[in-house]
Amino acid sequence: MIASKAVILAQGHRHSSAPGRHSFVRGELAAPPLLPLANRPLLEHALEWLDAGGVREVAVLAPEGLSAYTSRAVAKAAWRFDLTWLERSPGAGVGASLAGLADFLADEPFVLHLADSLSRQPLDSLLRQEQPGDGEAILFVQETAGRGAAVVDIRARRTASPFADHCAPAGVAILGTGVTEAAREVDPAPGHELEQLADVLQRGGGQVSTRRVADWWRLGHDADALLEGNRFALEGIAADYGGATLSRTSIQGAVVAHPSAIVESSVIRGPVIIGPGARVTHSYVGPYTSIGRDVVIEGSEIEHSIVFPAARIQHLSSRLEASVVGAGARVSREFRLPRALRVTVGDGAEVSLA
């Protein structure tokens, strides 16, 4: 095993500098670790991946105001590792907070995970027993064809970037002993921790190497990125709907429905996941759709979409596709409109469609 310990850096909200881009989710769910993909927060996906990789101790480090949400959001699973929840001190930067984990890390290499990515590759298969030396880091990187702005920004600040053209950090790194102390002053914007960490290490004479990964997804700034992550997560599910209440309903493919979910007079074509307390009636739910807790879908068609908790979708005249419907949102039909329909609705929004 390459590392027996891991630190999950559960950062807060991200802000994109790209013109015209804005958060598609408000409230605590806007923090990347809490965004649900296949009805499970990214933080829970990260913990599951570390557990499967054989990590024995995990510390989740979250800023003040977010730490309470992170511990409540994760299901009480029978992890094989010891899990510690830590709150970042007010005013403390990322680097200083990591340096403050000296007792937990005990001068051992560790996995740093930003809880904003998904992987189908097991951790222990990625590095084949390699581990970084003192003051060194191994960063996982992924192809960024057409999405290389972050790479350009990194290379502009550094004469010898560890990132190849069209590659950017994948959100996970293995850090050697001494790295956290060297990076004590690092305090980047959420989502750019690994870029700044690599910059600081190289400027100080440290070695930063990279390993390309495949079958990997990392969170972007828009709804399309979230939908792609949801598709990625749903591709691996196995059918499990035996406990749900089903009436005059056709189930096709991999469908997961919580035992408290109710589905009546509908067609559900997987991969689809239906959360606790959700109710689907006289509707079609197509592939790559996640339906959150207490959602109501009535007399509508939807596919390749994410419906956040407590939203209601009722009597639409056109199929809802490639859409993100925020928590508590209302989408309903009042008047006839052309068939094409694509929406991203924020938390608490109410939209009536003619």
Where are these regions (language model features)?
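Short internal beta-strands
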Residues: 57-63, 139-141, 306, 324
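Structural motif
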Residues: 9-13, 62-65, 114-116, 141-143, ...
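Conserved beta-strand termini and adjacent loop/short-helix elements that scaffold enzyme active sites
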Residues: 63, 86-88, 140-142, 162, ...
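Conserved beta-loop-beta/alpha segment of the NTase-like Rossmann-fold superfamily
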Residues: 68-153
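Left-handed beta-helix
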Residues: 1, 189-354
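Catalytic-core segments of class I nucleotidyltransferases/pyrophosphorylases
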Residues: 111, 118, 124-131, 144-146, ...
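N-terminal glycine-rich phosphate-binding loop and ensuing alpha1 helix
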Residues: 1-73, 81-83
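Short coil/turn segments at beta-strand junctions that form active-site/ligand-binding loops
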Residues: 2-4, 56, 107-109, 135, ...
